[in-house]
Design a protein with these regions (language model features):
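Positively charged, low-complexity terminal tracts
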Residues: 1-183
């Protein structure tokens, strides 16, 4: 939408987030959520006309347990105002494909195995983030999200995902791929 030479952008966050809670009595549990955001914008083409563009963004957020709330439920760092303990990874199409290959039994682990690191690796000017998603024989999946700020220490969040939770995750990620391509 042109408005005096400026384009307007709209961002739609899906109302529902997929969440897994893995609290522990000793307070060392964790939780995860997957969020979808759809960014719609208009950009000028080489011919001078304005064209709509759409970007579907997926984020995996893992948060450590921070204790218990006043009502006795587990609390997690993502509910704190200045959360610095949660780890967030923006999932690209390749990342989604690797997780789906693991959930479908085609691979034991998402991303590369062996070498300097295993799993999915993202790096930018602020540091790096890794996601390890591995099938555990007869027990479900192990998840580890970690970030290392440039010049800082590694911060990690890890928990398990049951086979049932994995099936729901598979359906949601397949739906995300369809959303990306509008199929």
């Amino acid at each position: 939408m042109q408005n005096g030479g400026l384009t307007s952008m709209s961002v739609t966050r899906k109302q529902e987030q997929w969440r897994i809670y893995k609290p522990r009595k000793d307070g060392s549990g964790a939780a995860s959520r997957i969020e979808m955001k759809i960014v719609s914008d208009e950009k000028p083409g080489k011919d001078g006309k304005t064209y709509p563009v759409r970007d579907v963004q997926m984020f995996w957020v893992a948060s450590p347990q921070t204790g218990y709330s006043d009502n006795g439920n587990a609390s997690f760092s993502w509910s704190q105002a200045n959360d610095s303990k949660s780890v967030t990874l923006k999932l690209g199409e390749h990342d989604i494909g690797e997780i789906l290959a693991t959930l479908s039994g085609l691979k034991v682990e998402a991303g590369q195995t062996g070498g300097k690191y295993s799993g999915l690796f993202h790096q930018n000017s602020r540091g790096s983030t890794t996601l390890q998603f591995k099938r555990m024989e007869g027990q479900g999946y192990a998840l580890r999200l970690a970030r290392k700020p440039k010049g800082g220490n590694v911060q990690e969040v890890k928990h398990t995902i049951s086979f049932g939770e994995g099936e729901v995750l598979r359906v949601l990620l397949e739906s995300a791929v369809r959303q990306i391509y509008r199929w």
